[in-house]
Every structure is written in C-alpha cells, then in structure tokens.
C-alpha cells in the first residue's frame, strides 16, 4: 500500500497564532486562562490546552472578575466584545486576522447603510461573530448557504447591497452561490479579494491533487471543523472513499485493506503529530514509506499580541 501526503496540510497561520496566544498566556499568567469557545476546532489541541489550565467557556458570565479571557480564532460579535469590556477582565483576541478582515468589511457596510449578505454555515461560531458586526437598523444582514437560499431572499434595497463569505467554505460551492447572487442582485458588490482564506483554498487544491492518485483519502480533523469537513466532501465528490478522523485510532483496517494507495491530509486546525500517528497506523496495515506530494509553499506568519511575545521556554 502506497501512502501519499497532501501538501500543504495541517496548521495554518491563524491556528498557529491562536494556539500560541493561549500557550503564552498560560506561561505568563498561569492557570486558569479562560477561552471563549474552543480556541480552534480540534479535539487534540483543546484537550492538550485544557490539561495545561485553559478553561473553555461559551458565556462571558462564566468568567470570574479579574480573570484572563481569550477570544477564539473564529472571532466574536460586537455584543460579546462589549460584554467583555464591561467586566473587570484582561482580554486577548485570538481571532484570525483573515476573519477580522471580513469583520471589517461588514462593519464598513453597516456604517454606510448597505445591506450585507454573508455566505456561510448557520450556527458556526465564525458566522455568528461575523453577523454580529452589523448594527445598522436601517439596513440588514442576511445569511445564505446555497443558491436556493439566494433565490428566496428578499432585501430592502437591491441598489445598496454587498456580500462576504465565511473563510472556511468550499471554493466550488461558494462560487455557485456567488454566481446566484450576481444573477439575483446585479448591483451587488463583493470584496476586492476573496474572503475564503489562503489556507482553505490551498488545502482544497492539495486534496484535489491527492484524490487524483489515491483510492482512499483520510482527512485528519475534528467533526466540528468546517475546513476539515470540506476536504472530506471534496474527495468524495471526486469519487473517492473519504473518512474524517480525529486520530489514528479511528482508522479501521477494512477501510484500507484493498487500497493500492491511501492519501492523507489534515485540516487547518490539526497538528502534524496526528498525521504522523496516522502514517504509523497505516504502516501497521502494510503501508510503505509516506511520500509527500508537491504543493504550494506557505510562509505566512501572524504575530501574537505584543504583550504575549515571549519565549515560552524561558518563562517555564
């Protein structure tokens, strides 16, 4: 059995930054550190940080006065931000800068009195945070997930309308929704640059290349990870058997027993140690040395807040 690795895969710059913010805060201030929502959607990462003293909460009311609070990489609404400001809390923001970019687009539209349409998945924390940037009662903020949603949507003023997207969507599906928006609302204005982030796009391109060669595709990522789910869906659309797994223990030998080639990738919130464990598991099932495919190089780095820029090893 041949083992192929997608390239790129795994951690993106926003996830690296968010995890570093929690780790550095723990090193500087000590436990407990409170984090609103899972800092990134990966069970291994969250469990590791929890063991070190991070407490993950959903409501600001759960945080005691005087505590350290961190917003997750997915971002928060203005209402949540204002609630935190009203409390005696030290707040650090781990929102991915590429999510913040979308927040700023929504806020600008709100100030201008433009109505805004967000393409995204209902209930996802990034969507809730982005929708929560709009505050103009004269306008409106709407969520669509599919072309069908677009055709049934009614807005107040089609002449003052803009759209944005969640950063972790399927590139292909989003293109279909944007096409529908432009047909339904010819005057609608979109962002100058696609809101779907570089890491999402690159990992989807990489899994497409992987699926062209592999019989079975394993996507390392948690069930609540939007970008990981999109990778598995893309491989399935290409006619491949694909499984979304949290770790190597999830793999069943029957999945790969007849496969000549197994492809492995990882969502943007999955650490590489999980991929290495998957490779070891596949080798137990008769796999050979893992080969990494050629792919797009990523060298983007997002800095942590200056108050947290320390060498954790020195603090520890």
UniProtKB/Swiss-Prot annotation:
The keyword Transmembrane helix does not apply. GO terms for molecular function: 4 iron, 4 sulfur cluster binding; 4-hydroxy-3-methylbut-2-enyl diphosphate reductase activity; metal ion binding. Keywords: 4Fe-4S, Iron, Iron-sulfur, Isoprene biosynthesis, Metal-binding, Oxidoreductase. Its cofactor is [4Fe-4S] cluster. One of its GO terms (biological process) is isopentenyl diphosphate biosynthetic process, methylerythritol 4-phosphate pathway. Pathway: Isoprenoid biosynthesis; dimethylallyl diphosphate biosynthesis; dimethylallyl diphosphate from (2E)-4-hydroxy-3-methylbutenyl diphosphate: step 1/1; Isoprenoid biosynthesis; isopentenyl diphosphate biosynthesis via DXP pathway; isopentenyl diphosphate from 1-deoxy-D-xylulose 5-phosphate: step 6/6. It comes from the Bacteria. [4Fe-4S] cluster binds at residues 12, 96, 197. It catalyses: isopentenyl diphosphate + 2 oxidized [2Fe-2S]-[ferredoxin] + H2O = (2E)-4-hydroxy-3-methylbut-2-enyl diphosphate + 2 reduced [2Fe-2S]-[ferredoxin] + 2 H(+); dimethylallyl diphosphate + 2 oxidized [2Fe-2S]-[ferredoxin] + H2O = (2E)-4-hydroxy-3-methylbut-2-enyl diphosphate + 2 reduced [2Fe-2S]-[ferredoxin] + 2 H(+). Dimethylallyl diphosphate binds at residues 41, 74, 124, 225-227, 269. The active site is at residue 126. (2E)-4-hydroxy-3-methylbut-2-enyl diphosphate binds at residues 41, 74, 124, 167, 225-227, 269. Its EC number is 1.17.7.4. Isopentenyl diphosphate binds at residues 41, 74, 124, 225-227, 269. The keyword S-adenosyl-L-methionine does not apply. Binds 1 [4Fe-4S] cluster per subunit. HAMAP family: IspH. Catalyzes the conversion of 1-hydroxy-2-methyl-2-(E)-butenyl 4-diphosphate (HMBPP) into a mixture of isopentenyl diphosphate (IPP) and dimethylallyl diphosphate (DMAPP). Acts in the terminal step of the DOXP/MEP pathway for isoprenoid precursor biosynthesis. Belongs to the IspH family. Homodimer. NCBIfam families: ispH_lytB, PRK01045.1-2, PRK01045.1-4. This is 4-hydroxy-3-methylbut-2-enyl diphosphate reductase. It comes from Salmonella heidelberg (strain SL476). The gene is ispH.
């Amino acid at each position: 059995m041949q083992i192929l690795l997608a390239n790129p895969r795994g951690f993106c710059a926003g996830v690296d930054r968010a995890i570093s913010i929690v780790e550095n805060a723990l090193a500087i201030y000590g436990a407990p550190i409170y984090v609103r929502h899972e800092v990134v959607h990966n069970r291994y990462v969250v469990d590791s940080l929890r063991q070190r003293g991070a407490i993950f909460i959903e409501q600001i009311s759960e945080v005691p006065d005087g505590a350290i609070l961190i917003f997750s990489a997915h971002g928060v609404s203005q209402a949540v931000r204002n609630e935190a400001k009203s409390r005696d809390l030290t707040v650090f923001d781990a929102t991915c800068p590429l999510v913040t970019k979308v927040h700023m687009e929504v806020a600008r539209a709100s100030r201008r009195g433009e109505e805004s349409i967000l393409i995204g998945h209902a209930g996802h924390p990034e969507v809730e945070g982005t929708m929560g940037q709009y505050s103009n009662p004269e306008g409106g903020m709407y969520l669509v997930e599919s072309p069908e949603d677009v055709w049934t949507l009614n807005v107040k003023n089609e002449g003052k309308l803009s759209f944005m997207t969640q950063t972790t969507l399927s590139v292909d599906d989003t293109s279909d929704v944007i096409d529908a928006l432009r047909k339904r609302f010819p005057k609608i204005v979109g962002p100058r640059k696609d809101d779907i982030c570089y890491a999402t796009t690159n990992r989807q391109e990489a899994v497409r290349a992987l699926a062209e060669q592999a019989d079975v595709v394993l996507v390392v990522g948690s069930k609540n990870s939007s970008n990981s789910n999109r990778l598995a869906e893309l491989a399935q659309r290409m006619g491949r058997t694909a499984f979304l797994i949290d770790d190597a223990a999830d793999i069943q030998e029957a999945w790969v027993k007849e496969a000549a080639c197994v492809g492995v990738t990882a969502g943007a919130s999955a650490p590489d140690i999980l991929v290495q464990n998957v490779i070891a598991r596949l080798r137990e099932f008769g796999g050979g040395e893992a080969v990494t495919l050629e792919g797009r190089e990523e060298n983007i780095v997002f800095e942590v807040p200056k108050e947290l820029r320390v060498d954790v090893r020195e603090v520890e």
